[in-house]
């Protein structure tokens, strides 16, 4: 396969570039890899991309080549000097494969020099050819030239054009060439035309394309060769103003097939590209293009895809070759056994035919051995007898006394001597070759011919046996070989069927993986750390400081959210939000988990909080006198801290489904409200609790407590919605400090029913008689709230329930509405002081004190408090805080209390704004205005959704996000059996988003390397009973490098039945 330009190719493409690109200005310079660069050129009505590959090629391209995320230093230097400059000329230096591109004129000119020979090079120089930057530093010792920055590029050292070879010089060259060398190889180093053009000219002059140098070349032949050289020079001149066509020469490869009846398929692959259609290619398949530049672009752009085809073809050939080798091996074994049977049978028959001679020979040798004659003397005696014409001695060909055998040459005595060929000795079979041993024996046995009965045969005769016994021994060998042949045939059939089945499976896998790799589309976000949240938001993060910089500069757009953690190595995460609507809390928490897991917290196993800000709060402008390094940004304004996240990631696969199947998966990752998400929430919470908090497995109330609960009519609604564990959580939550320093304690005082009802109607929008279940999981969205009318209508039935009011709220209400006695007021103020002084004490102790101070405990509460103290006696403050953060138990009630407190204040009293502290419960949506809580806005949105049953939010989002959301809908972790699956993409994301995924494993900090962990997870998926054949094929097609690239550090893999899969 042709891989680089020849001189003819270079001149042809330069002629086309000069005709199309001169006068265009450089828009930008990009690097594809360390050897390939793209120069974007433009003029008012035309744009073009010039591709340069050091040592290989130069051409324009219409294909989209992948560019490096961060431009290299060479590309940056080219941008600095070449950007916005006009391309003035593109010329070849001498006849060497060196191109000089000049950008700009006179002293403002810069030269970009590309070397297309040897290892290649790209050099940027100024107008005096002083090197400003160079791709590959080197020293040319032969010319004493150093290629380095600030050195002068030696343009005068390029190979100059030489006069045509003379007849005398050509004769000398051919005479000095080694005999048998191909003629075009002899001429190629002397001429600048390239082997293809030389071969074409040789064919045109009547030579063979592979003509060799030998003694038969006469003077007239050398003259013909000289004519060939002149023709090649004419072609080279044509390329100076080339405006012809381009040709890609194809190679036809036969695709192997297991079916003999099926016609063989041909695969056409690109082999060469040329500006002319040469004579040697007339019989080959080829593709014609309107220009050579387009032919080269097509050749190199499709070569990668064809490499996949060729690799698959080689794998198929290798698989079929193995099957063919198995078949031939069994055939050779059977043939060797058949021959062994025939030889043993013939030897037995020859011994029977020559009984007297064999018996006589056995007796003579036995007698000599019995007389203790030396073995050497016995040999001498045999030779003397042979010289005298003794028939017995003539039959003995060799004495093998060390093995107690004699080799005899036996003939069929019933055949006339004329029937025996004179060269019978040449076909004598060696009796030692009873069975093939080793590869050499196998090769010899392939050439063995059938033994002929009329030919003499060498037979080994055992001296310890009689002639008949020796014949019987050979017949026994024959019978044993027959049985062995039968067993071999049966085993061969089984082995061949197994090999054939395995080969078919291999061929199928190769074809499937090849088709998947071709269909596989690499999305723009895969170069980053990424995942799609449980609510269909794309979250991307940088792998390093450079990618962090790029993400903020290029991909942080208005409406997006920036998420980070104050830890070393933490990635900068961006939540893409094309609609501009408020990001749900669950997605924010998942992005925070990602920021933490891709930081030093993973290896240190530290649980902490991430934070988020709006896009306009992120800036690269540093304060006066300070400098921001790469990947560092200035955050202006308030940071909104998220709840602490557990270091828990998951590994899974997203399947790309066909467009016809996308409708099945719309809404899989929509923003869910309480009624829709309760089942998912419960299962996910139970899974997390079981895996991470085994100490909280209990919590069921006893029969006595259940009876006590049912015995309290005023608390029926409350107690039937929460278990004792929830009570403990609420008890610990009640005394958590608020943002402004006040302790928002939940009071258990029971107000009179009439007063309760009156305050409820005037002050509160919702009666506090139900338990908000959003604390069960910190990531889930806020639940729906009942409409005001419904809550007002249900006041009578709910007025007996207990409301939890802070001391401040009750104080304000009593000032506003009820004249209270001074004693009662003093009691309330004392309670306030007690709560403020006890902010950081244990939650269940505070709760018990407050209940005791307010009023006597109700029936059953004393025993409950005693059991709660016993259950949580081993918990310290840190453990309790972690549990509270996991369950997010204070989230929704705080917001409700805040709203209630504001409505309870007089209108002329300003609402007190809490200070900005790093708490997950408060998130800012607008920095300019008074910051409403994110949860409050989410409640308002959900209220609208409740009021309008025909919510068209999903359709609105679809219109806003367009193709991007369609893409996310086509990537699913829950493939349907009837889906048409295109390919699979490995994904590493917070484990909470994978609740409904078909395949998933949990990753936590551990000691296993990520490559091995990815293979363990893949092996688990492959052995899953639910895995279909297509899904397994998709798993196999994923490259090993793509599997583990997003896994954070060293991990521990956890999944159901993982140990059972490993044993398999």
From Swiss-Prot:
<feature type="modified residue" description="Phosphoserine">
    <location>
        <position position="737"/>
    </location>
</feature>
<keyword id="KW-0597">Phosphoprotein</keyword>
<feature type="compositionally biased region" description="Polar residues">
    <location>
        <begin position="960"/>
        <end position="973"/>
    </location>
</feature>
<keyword id="KW-0175">Coiled coil</keyword>
<dbReference type="GO" id="GO:1990112">
    <property type="term" value="C:RQC complex"/>
</dbReference>
<dbReference type="InterPro" id="IPR008532">
    <property type="entry name" value="NFACT_RNA-bd"/>
</dbReference>
<feature type="compositionally biased region" description="Basic and acidic residues">
    <location>
        <begin position="947"/>
        <end position="959"/>
    </location>
</feature>
<feature type="coiled-coil region">
    <location>
        <begin position="296"/>
        <end position="359"/>
    </location>
</feature>
<feature type="coiled-coil region">
    <location>
        <begin position="858"/>
        <end position="882"/>
    </location>
</feature>
<dbReference type="InterPro" id="IPR051608">
    <property type="entry name" value="RQC_Subunit_NEMF"/>
</dbReference>
<dbReference type="GO" id="GO:0065003">
    <property type="term" value="P:protein-containing complex assembly"/>
</dbReference>
<dbReference type="GO" id="GO:0005634">
    <property type="term" value="C:nucleus"/>
</dbReference>
<dbReference type="GO" id="GO:0043023">
    <property type="term" value="F:ribosomal large subunit binding"/>
</dbReference>
<feature type="region of interest" description="Disordered">
    <location>
        <begin position="694"/>
        <end position="718"/>
    </location>
</feature>
<feature type="region of interest" description="Disordered">
    <location>
        <begin position="420"/>
        <end position="451"/>
    </location>
</feature>
<comment type="subunit">
    <text>Component of the ribosome quality control complex (RQC), composed of the E3 ubiquitin ligase LTN1, TCF25 and NEMF associated with the 60S ribosomal subunit. The complex probably also contains VCP/p97 and its ubiquitin-binding cofactors. Interacts (via its N-terminus) with XPO1.</text>
</comment>
<feature type="modified residue" description="Phosphoserine">
    <location>
        <position position="417"/>
    </location>
</feature>
<feature type="coiled-coil region">
    <location>
        <begin position="481"/>
        <end position="512"/>
    </location>
</feature>
<comment type="function">
    <text>Key component of the ribosome quality control complex (RQC), a ribosome-associated complex that mediates the extraction of incompletely synthesized nascent chains from stalled ribosomes as well as their ubiquitin-mediated proteasomal degradation. Thereby, frees 60S subunit ribosomes from the stalled translation complex and prevents the accumulation of nascent polypeptide chains that are potentially toxic for the cell.</text>
</comment>
<keyword id="KW-0539">Nucleus</keyword>
<keyword id="KW-0963">Cytoplasm</keyword>
<dbReference type="InterPro" id="IPR021846">
    <property type="entry name" value="NFACT-C"/>
</dbReference>
<feature type="compositionally biased region" description="Basic residues">
    <location>
        <begin position="438"/>
        <end position="447"/>
    </location>
</feature>
<feature type="region of interest" description="Disordered">
    <location>
        <begin position="731"/>
        <end position="973"/>
    </location>
</feature>
<dbReference type="GO" id="GO:1904678">
    <property type="term" value="F:alpha-aminoacyl-tRNA binding"/>
</dbReference>
<dbReference type="GO" id="GO:1990116">
    <property type="term" value="P:ribosome-associated ubiquitin-dependent protein catabolic process"/>
</dbReference>
<dbReference type="GO" id="GO:0140708">
    <property type="term" value="P:CAT tailing"/>
</dbReference>
<feature type="compositionally biased region" description="Polar residues">
    <location>
        <begin position="771"/>
        <end position="781"/>
    </location>
</feature>
<dbReference type="Pfam" id="PF05833">
    <property type="entry name" value="NFACT_N"/>
</dbReference>
<feature type="modified residue" description="Phosphothreonine">
    <location>
        <position position="7"/>
    </location>
</feature>
<dbReference type="Pfam" id="PF11923">
    <property type="entry name" value="NFACT-C"/>
</dbReference>
<feature type="compositionally biased region" description="Basic residues">
    <location>
        <begin position="859"/>
        <end position="870"/>
    </location>
</feature>
<dbReference type="GO" id="GO:0005829">
    <property type="term" value="C:cytosol"/>
</dbReference>
<comment type="similarity">
    <text>Belongs to the NEMF family.</text>
</comment>
<dbReference type="Pfam" id="PF05670">
    <property type="entry name" value="NFACT-R_1"/>
</dbReference>
<feature type="compositionally biased region" description="Basic and acidic residues">
    <location>
        <begin position="828"/>
        <end position="839"/>
    </location>
</feature>
<feature type="compositionally biased region" description="Acidic residues">
    <location>
        <begin position="694"/>
        <end position="707"/>
    </location>
</feature>
<protein>
    <recommendedName>
        <fullName>Ribosome quality control complex subunit NEMF</fullName>
    </recommendedName>
</protein>
<dbReference type="GO" id="GO:0022626">
    <property type="term" value="C:cytosolic ribosome"/>
</dbReference>
<dbReference type="GO" id="GO:0051168">
    <property type="term" value="P:nuclear export"/>
</dbReference>
<feature type="compositionally biased region" description="Basic and acidic residues">
    <location>
        <begin position="731"/>
        <end position="756"/>
    </location>
</feature>
């Amino acid at each position: 396969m042709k891989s680089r330009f020849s001189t003819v190719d270079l001149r042809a493409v330069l002629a086309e570039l000069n005709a199309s690109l001169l006068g265009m200005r450089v828009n930008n310079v990009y690097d594809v890899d360390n050897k390939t660069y793209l120069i974007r050129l433009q003029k008012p009505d035309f744009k073009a991309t010039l591709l340069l590959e050091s040592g290989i090629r130069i051409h324009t391209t219409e294909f989209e080549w992948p560019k490096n995320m961060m431009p290299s230093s060479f590309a940056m230097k080219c941008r600095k000097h070449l950007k916005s400059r006009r391309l003035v000329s593109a010329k070849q230096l001498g006849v060497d494969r060196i191109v000089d591109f000049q950008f700009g004129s006179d002293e403002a000119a810069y030269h970009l020099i590309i070397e297309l020979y040897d290892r290649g090079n790209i050099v940027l120089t100024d107008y005096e050819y002083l090197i400003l930057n160079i791709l590959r530093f080197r020293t040319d010792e032969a010319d004493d030239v150093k290629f380095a920055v600030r050195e002068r590029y030696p343009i005068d050292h390029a190979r100059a054009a030489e006069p045509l070879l003379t007849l005398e010089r050509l004769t000398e060259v051919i005479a000095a060439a080694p005999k048998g060398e191909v003629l075009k190889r002899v001429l190629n180093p002397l001429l600048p035309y390239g082997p293809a053009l030389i071969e074409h000219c040789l064919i045109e002059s009547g030579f063979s394309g592979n003509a060799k140098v030998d003694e038969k070349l006469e003077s007239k032949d050398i003259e013909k060769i000289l004519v060939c050289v002149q023709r090649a020079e004419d072609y080279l001149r044509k390329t100076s103003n080339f405006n012809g066509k381009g040709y890609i020469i194809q190679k036809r490869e036969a695709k192997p097939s297991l079916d003999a009846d099926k016609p063989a398929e041909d695969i056409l692959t690109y082999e060469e590209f040329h500006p002319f259609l040469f004579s040697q290619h007339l019989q080959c398949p080829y593709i014609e293009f309107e220009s050579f530049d387009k032919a080269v672009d097509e050749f190199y752009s499709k070569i990668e895809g064809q490499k996949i085809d060729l690799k698959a073809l080689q794998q198929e050939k290798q698989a079929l070759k193995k099957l063919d080798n198995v078949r031939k091996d069994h055939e050779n074994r059977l043939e060797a056994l058949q021959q062994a049977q025939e030889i043993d049978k013939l030897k037995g028959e020859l011994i029977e035919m020559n009984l007297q001679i064999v018996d006589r020979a056995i007796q003579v040798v036995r007698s000599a051995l019995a007389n203790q004659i030396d073995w050497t003397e016995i040999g001498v005696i045999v030779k003397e007898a042979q010289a005298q014409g003794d028939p017995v001695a003539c039959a003995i060909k060799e004495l093998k006394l060390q093995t107690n055998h004699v080799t005899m040459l036996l003939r069929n005595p019933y055949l006339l001597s004329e029937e025996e060929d004179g060269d019978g000795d040449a076909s004598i079979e060696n009796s030692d070759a009873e069975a093939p041993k080793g590869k050499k024996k196998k090769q010899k046995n392939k050439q063995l011919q059938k033994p002929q009965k009329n030919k003499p045969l060498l037979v080994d005769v055992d001296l310890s046996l009689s002639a008949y016994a020796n014949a019987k021994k050979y017949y026994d060998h024959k019978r044993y070989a027959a049985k062995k042949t039968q067993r071999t045939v049966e085993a061969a059939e089984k082995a061949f069927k197994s090999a054939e089945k395995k080969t078919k499976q291999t061929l199928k896998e190769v074809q499937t993986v090849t088709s998947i790799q071709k269909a596989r589309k690499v999305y723009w976000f895969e170069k980053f750390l990424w995942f799609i949240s449980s609510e269909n938001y794309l979250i991307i993060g940088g792998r390093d400081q450079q990618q962090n910089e790029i993400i903020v500069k290029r991909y942080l757009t208005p409406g997006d959210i920036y998420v980070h953690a104050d830890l070393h190595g933490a990635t900068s995460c961006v939540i893409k939000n094309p609609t501009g609507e408020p990001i749900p809390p669950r997605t924010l928490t998942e992005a925070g988990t990602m920021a933490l897991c891709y930081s030093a917290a993973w290896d240190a196993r530290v649980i902490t909080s991430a934070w988020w800000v709006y896009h306009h709060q992120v800036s690269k402008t540093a304060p006066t006198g300070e400098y921001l390094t790469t990947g560092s940004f200035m955050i202006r304004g308030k940071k909104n801290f998220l709840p602490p996240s557990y270091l828990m990631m998951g590994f899974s696969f997203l399947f790309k489904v066909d467009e016809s199947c996308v409708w099945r998966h719309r809404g899989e990752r929509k923003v869910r409200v309480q009624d829709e998400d309760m089942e998912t929430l419960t299962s996910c919470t139970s899974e997390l609790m079981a895996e991470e908090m085994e100490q909280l497995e209990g919590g069921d109330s006893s029969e006595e407590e259940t009876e006590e609960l049912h015995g309290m009519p005023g608390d029926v609604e409350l107690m039937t919605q929460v278990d004792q564990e929830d009570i403990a959580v609420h008890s610990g939550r009640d005394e958590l400090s608020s943002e402004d320093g006040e302790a928002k304690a939940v009071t258990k005082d029971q107000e009179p029913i009439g007063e309760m009802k009156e305050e409820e109607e005037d002050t509160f929008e919702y009666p506090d008689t139900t338990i908000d279940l959003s604390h069960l999981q910190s990531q889930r969205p806020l639940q729906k709230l009942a409409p005001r009318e419904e809550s007002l209508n249900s006041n009578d039935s709910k007025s007996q329930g207990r409301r939890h009011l802070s001391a401040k709220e009750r104080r304000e209400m009593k000032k506003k509405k009820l004249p209270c006695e001074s004693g009662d007021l003093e009691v309330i103020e004392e309670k306030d002081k007690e709560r403020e002084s006890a902010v950081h004490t244990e939650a269940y102790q505070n709760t018990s004190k407050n209940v005791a101070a307010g009023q006597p405990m109700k029936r059953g509460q004393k025993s409950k408090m005693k059991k709660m103290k016993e259950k949580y006696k081993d918990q310290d403050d840190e453990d309790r805080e972690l549990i509270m953060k996991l369950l997010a138990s204070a989230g929704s009630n705080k917001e409700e209390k805040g709203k209630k407190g504001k409505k309870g204040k007089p209108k002329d009293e300003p609402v007190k704004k809490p200070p900005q502290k790093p708490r997950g419960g408060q998130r800012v949506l607008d920095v300019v205005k008074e910051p409403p809580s994110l949860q409050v806005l989410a409640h308002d949105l959900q209220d609208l959704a409740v009021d309008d049953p025909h919510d068209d939010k999903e359709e609105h989002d679809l219109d806003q996000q367009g193709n991007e959301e369609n893409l996310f809908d086509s990537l699913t972790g829950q493939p349907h059996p009837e889906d048409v699956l295109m390919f699979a993409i490995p994904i590493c994301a917070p484990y909470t988003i994978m609740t409904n995924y078909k395949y998933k494993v949990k990753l936590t900090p551990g000691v296993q390397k990520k490559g091995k962990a990815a293979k363990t997870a893949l092996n688990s998926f492959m052995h899953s009973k639910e895995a279909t054949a297509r899904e397994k094929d998709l798993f196999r097609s994923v490259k090993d490098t793509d599997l583990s690239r997003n896994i954070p550090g060293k991990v521990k893999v956890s999944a159901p039945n993982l140990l059972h899969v490993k044993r398999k």
